Amino acid sequence: IAQAGYMLVGVAAGTEFGFSGTVYYLLVYLVTNLAVFAIISWVEKGSGSSAVSAFAGLNRRSPGMALVMMVALLSLGGIPPFGGFFAKVLVFGAAVQSHYVWLAVLGILNSVIALYYYLKIMKVMYLDKPDETSWKVTPALQWRVALALCIACIILLGVIYAPWLNGISLAVTGF
């Protein structure tokens, strides 16, 4: 729900910059959530639970899956160099440009709070020990390829943003 609120910050700005930022945010959010929900589904299949405790020791069970989840969570938290960081810069920057500084400040504060919860999940994945009913599910090749593509997009959208943003701006101004 918070992520949708961040997108609406760009809409509230009411400018081309804000609308472009919102569309960019949607693109980043799409690939990031694909990765997150794929990992949650995979963990639930292996453990029978989607509770945070089911992620305990994920790094030991599947280091690659833990890495994918970590990158996706850091992107959702708005940490550079991932796409979520640049998307938040765009929508919060649009708010500031439109004199909604208070809205940008609230969004940033909320992002910091959300990051705390994302870091708690990462702590469970990397530092907590798995329970005795250890499970191991090896993801199929198509899962691994899809997740690799998601992570590549999350990184590329954070590092090489100009071509994407230019295309989005052209689309936004066409309406």
Labelled PLM ranges:
Residues 2-175:
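Alpha-helical transmembrane segments of multi-pass membrane proteins predominantly involved
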